[in-house]
Amino acid sequence: MTICQSANNPYADCAAHYVESRKLSELVLDEFCSKTGIFKQNVREMDDMTGTNWSQVPTVIVEMGFLSNVSDDRLMATEYFRQEAAIGIANGVDAYFEWLETSTVDENATGDQTATESPTETDIS
């Protein structure tokens, strides 16, 4: 599971980063689950996490498993899983930066953000 703030987060300007944080969370979750084989849960939007509430940049919190789950606990204790988890998270961050290169985040008159694809060279000429 990954966690990001909601679009309506009442703290600071973190809502300004919602679209990017949501996309980062989705990509990290996809890559993490693909690499580790962990059951994919959804991205959770929460507004009670200090780590996301006051951030000035897009954020993601990664829950790699549940210590209350014996299977997860044993799995997270292995070097192999931790290495695969790190690779999956890194792949997700790389995918996010690739997405940023091909997308722009536009702010409309209501202050909401939407992600759009950047124009290609053929669109410009």
Q: Model-derived features: where do they sit?
A:
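Active-site-proximal helix/loop segments of hydrolytic enzymes
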Residues: 1-125
